[in-house]
Amino acid sequence: MTRVADLIFARLADAGLSHAFVVTGGGAMFLNDALRREPRFRWTCHHHEQAAAMAAEGYARVAGRPAVVSVTSGPGGINALNGVWGAWTDSIPMIVVSGQVKRETCMSSYPGLHVRQLGDQEADIISLVRGITKYAASITDPRKAERHVEEAVRLATHGRKGPVSYTHLTLPTNREV
């Protein structure tokens, strides 16, 4: 059985994407592994998520096609926002894939619970990026993963170009397998 994380990078490669700018982390461990396994991708590790997002923006400007930013949950996704904002304002295509804590420890699973954070290193990144991306979704149903990836690539590369965050595609850790 194909893991959702493997499917994501396989479909991105099928769409012609070949470069990823990465900061690894526990909240994206299966995404990190899937990227390593996909032979059509070249990836560069960075020390900070902002640098990874800005490197992806620079790559897209030079290559004329989007790159992938892959970061971990919570602060990882938040740290990438300066680069996502830059891509948004300059209409630069970018696909951001971030990890997320287990669905059971996401605030979105408990709408009546009035706390700011539930899971360790959790952030509601989708709400944060919705205004600066063309598409933002959390893959909570593995059967819909392929559709999310296709939509993210389509929106990032057609019409007025811009970042998508699954594009932020977030993938809860327990949905990555």
Explain the meaning of each model-derived region:
Residues 1-169:
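N-terminal alpha/beta PP-like core and its mobile active-site loop of ThDP/TPP-dependent enzymes
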Residues 168-177:
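Single conserved hydrophobic/aromatic residue that forms the stacking wall/gate
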